[in-house]
């Protein structure tokens, strides 16, 4: 039996979200044949021991806390990302749900609906510590640290591994967006898996 105390009803939303993420991680199935796996025992891991990199994107620190490729997760994937001031995600969309929990810092979410031929001018939403963001499926978006300190977010996606379509700008046609799969943090493991299959 697992007992997870999250305090009173007035507990921080971060504690609640992180607790739910830990439960999902605990009850998820692991795939022993997953490439580059960090799976099996121990179920509880020290987050400081997980791989962290910027994957060629200055100002980004990415860590897959629980993922499909690295840990064998089937339904959700959880990342911890830190953006230095001025750094940003590419303009992109994906066919999965995405939720951000802002742990610290501030920034801007740029979000455009994708019902036309191209995203168009995005709507700007300020984001800040203890705010949550829900990205609708296939809506083009970008997160940028527009603050003066690091922006740290916990990101939860559905249906991993993620397949991302990247735009050069907000007026690039959807049909011209470039598919990036596997995504940067899954590349090495998926390439090693393909080599093993030959």
Curated annotation (Swiss-Prot):
Entry binding sites for Zn(2+): 92, 94, 98, 141
Keyword terms of this UniProt record: Auxin signaling pathway, Cell membrane, Disulfide bond, Endoplasmic reticulum, Glycoprotein, Membrane, Metal-binding, Receptor, Signal, Ubl conjugation, Zinc
* Cleaved signal peptide residues: 1-33
Q: Where in the cell is it found?
A: Endoplasmic reticulum lumen; Cell membrane
* Consequence of substituting residue 99 to A: No effect on activation by auxin
Residue numbers of motif Prevents secretion from ER?
195-198
Q: What is the effect of changing residue 185 to Y?
A: Slight reduction of activation by auxin. Slight reduction of activation by auxin
Q: Which residues are reported to be glycosylated? A: 130
- Summarize the impact of residue 141 to N: In abp1-10; lower auxin sensitivity and altered responses to continuous light and shade
Task: Tell me the Pfam families matching this sequence.
Answer: Auxin_BP
PROSITE patterns the UniProt entry points to:
ER_TARGET
- When the coding gene is removed by deletion, what phenotypic consequences does the entry describe? Embryo lethality, when homozygous. No visible phenotype was found for other null mutants. Reduced auxin-triggered phosphorylation status modulation of RAF-like kinases (e.g. RAF20 and RAF24).
Post-translationally, this protein is described as follows, namely: Glycosylated. Ubiquitinated by RMA2, leading to proteasomal degradation.
Cellular compartments per GO CC:
endoplasmic reticulum lumen; plasma membrane
Q: Which cysteines are joined by disulfide bonds?
A: 36-189
Asked if the keyword Transcription belongs to this entry, the reply reads no
Summary of subunit composition and partner proteins = Homodimer. May interact with the GPI-anchored plasma membrane protein SKU5 and its family members. Interacts with TMK1 (via extracellular domain).
| Function summary | Auxin receptor that controls cell elongation and cell division. Involved in embryonic morphogenesis. Acts on the cell cycle, endocycle, cell plate formation, and cell expansion and contributes to the control of auxin-related gene expression. Controls root meristem size and mediates auxin responsiveness. Involved in activation of ROP GTPases in response to auxin and regulation of clathrin-mediated endocytosis in roots. Acts as a positive factor in clathrin recruitment to the plasma membrane, thereby promoting endocytosis.
Q: Provide the protein name.
A: Auxin-binding protein 1
Q: What is the lineage of its organism?
A: Eukaryota, Viridiplantae, Streptophyta, Embryophyta, Tracheophyta
Q: Which gene specifies this protein's sequence? A: ERABP1
